[in-house]
């Protein structure tokens, strides 16, 4: 009887974790793993003293030619992140693990990053990755390119 109760408790505790594994549906997973990746729009963090800071290159507005960042998540659970700031480029690669709405990275040096809480909005084609210290807002790269083209047409009509 005691063993049965232990198994019952273990099964009961495991239910939320089993359900959490499928936080994204099939279409959302396809979007998350889009081959074009995700453009980093904004990146902000809370310092230890509690004052939020915003990275000047990633302030929510496009800065083509000055800075850009793209995160690509593949179906084989690998990632690549390329950040360009004023002609300098930094690339990071590794693996990622998605467990429910938690996304964690391990880069090529074995450095662990995360887990981040993942919020994907399929309608706006946007992605938010956040944990207490940092928040990143991303847009599907193909949508970002469309947005830049539309902005260019508005700013420079023929």
Model-found features: residue ranges?
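Lipid interaction determinants
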Residues: 18-93, 97-158
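Sec-dependent N-terminal signal peptides
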Residues: 4-13
